[in-house]
Amino acid sequence: MNSTTQAPQPVYQWTADEAIRFLKEWNFSLGIILLFVTIILQFGYTSRSMFVYVVKMILLWLMWPLTIVLCIFNCVYALNNVYLGFSIVFTIVSIIMWIMYFVNSIRLFIRTGSWWSFNPETNNLMCTDMKGTVYVRPIIEDYHTLTATIIRGHLYMQGVKLGTGFSLSDLPAYVTVAKVSHLCTYKRAFLDKVDGVSGFAVYVKSKVGNYRLPSNKPSGMDTALLRI
């Protein structure tokens, strides 16, 4: 029997001229996309625009699956064994970190019941009970004090607007910040009225425990929280 040997297929490689031509063709589109992403990341804060902040969170959330796909692609089309080894390590690390993100987000969701638990930027959720409605908003840092400000009926917590139609008498005695492993309780330590419809209050961290629900009572705080 006659056996035929197939010639190996040549490996296609980009030349410098092709790379320059690609940049010339897609430079405008890439510039617009990078400008859009930069603006979103720069100005995406809850204290500025909630819509822009949500778009920012979507972009950050998409980074993980995109990174995993690119790492897997590098594993399939690795240039050599060294690149293959690094690609496998990066793929495993990316998948583990993504799984950890979902595990922590689900734990935080069980604690708060808020979809803000899946925020990829932070695991700190500030919970404020106003007239029986619990407002949950993400905060970046673990603050020792929280500030509530009311300006002509508009309520702001740490600079984030929560709603309108409130007065200083509506401010709760306690505010909570939920984390993955515990819940921090902040007690109102100072209240000052600027005029008849404006003022502010300062809350100081007073208690840390493993609870599921934020307090919604001015007294009897331990009975208002369900221990996990």
Swiss-Prot record:
InterPro entries: M_CoV, M_HCoV-like. One of its GO terms (cellular component) is viral envelope. It is found in: Virion membrane; Host Golgi apparatus membrane. Residues 2-25, 78-85 are virion surface. Disulfide bonds: none annotated. Glycans are attached at N2. Residues 47-56, 107-228 are intravirion. It comes from the Viruses. Coiled coil: none annotated. Keywords: Glycoprotein, Host Golgi apparatus, Host membrane, Host-virus interaction, Membrane, Transmembrane, Transmembrane helix, Viral envelope protein, Viral immunoevasion, Viral matrix protein, Virion. It is a multi-pass membrane protein. One of its GO terms (molecular function) is structural constituent of virion. The chain crosses the membrane at residues 26-46, 57-77, 86-106. PROSITE patterns: COV_M. Belongs to the betacoronaviruses M protein family. Homomultimer. Interacts with envelope E protein in the budding compartment of the host cell, which is located between endoplasmic reticulum and the Golgi complex. Forms a complex with HE and S proteins. Interacts with nucleocapsid N protein. This interaction probably participates in RNA packaging into the virus. Component of the viral envelope that plays a central role in virus morphogenesis and assembly via its interactions with other viral proteins. This is Membrane protein. It comes from Murine coronavirus (strain 2) (MHV-2). The gene is M.
